[in-house]
Amino acid sequence: MKDVMILTGAGQIGMAIARRVGYGMKIVIGDKKMENAETISRIMNEAGFDTMPAEMELSSRESIVKLIERAQSFGEVSMLVNAAGVSPSQAPIEAILKVDLYGTAVLLEEVGKVIKKGGVGVTISSQSGWRMPALTAEEDKLLATAPTEELLDLPLLQPENIRDTLHAYQLAKRCNEKRVMAESVKWGQRGARLNDIAPGIVVTPLALDEFNGPRGDFYKNMFANCPAGRPGTADEIANVAELLMSDKGAFITGATFLIDGGATASYFYGPLAPEK
């Protein structure tokens, strides 16, 4: 039996993180598209890792539980890397909320029930969660603590209160951050830690969809006018995840780390600020 990592989302960011911290472990790779999971599994196995692909639908509690049970058949779950999700250009409002918001909440909840003492998790949200106007304290608390099966019934998540897919995505990512804070308290009762990384524009297939989508010029302008002057890479996100998931990050839990090359800073206080 081995320590087991659950990696959800067979993409560049998830793989980069798993390669940093997953050596010596069994890595169960879950993705909505089995061919994606198989591709990442093959690449990692050929590099000496021990992985297996699995089909998983993040919007389904049943699918999430099945993935966790599969992982437990190899040993205790000691790490979670959640890099699954959809983008504003890929999905309608309802799907964004069901996958990115509800699905992430369920995953953190279910893994939190079984995570090994000393275990650690990281979930990938987005800088988008930082771009919205502040919610009320009550709305933030509801996003953090409402029972998962009641999340999508919250008033602020009803269709008439959501402008477009970007707004839905922002709400989902804000919820991810709040949910990590609340769930980290429960994980802590098991002696485990949980954190969130909110990347900016990182070059991945998902980002390339955005660059070529209806908001492509917006995103290209964003990294052209942020302090870093460029998009990020998956390895740069993995740099931070490696810290958070190592013993050097032992005092870090319930936190969100914004890694966006300064784009959010420029949005509020620089050339990316919206015109009045």
Regions found by a protein language model. Give the residues of each.
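Canonical Rossmann dinucleotide-binding motif of NAD(H)/NADP(H)-dependent dehydrogenases/reductases
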Residues: M1-V28
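Conserved glycine-rich Rossmann-like NAD(P)H-binding loop of the short-chain dehydrogenase/reductase
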Residues: Y23-T39
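Rossmann-fold cofactor-recognition segment
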Residues: M44-E62
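Catalytic loop of short-chain dehydrogenase/reductase
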Residues: G85-Q90, K117-R190, P199-T204
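A glycine/serine/threonine-rich, flexible loop-to-helix segment
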Residues: L135-A146, V202-N225, S266-K276
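Short, small/polar-rich loop/turn modules that mediate ligand/substrate recognition or access, typified
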Residues: R193, I252-G254
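A conserved structural motif in NAD(P)-dependent oxidoreductases
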Residues: C226-I237, K248
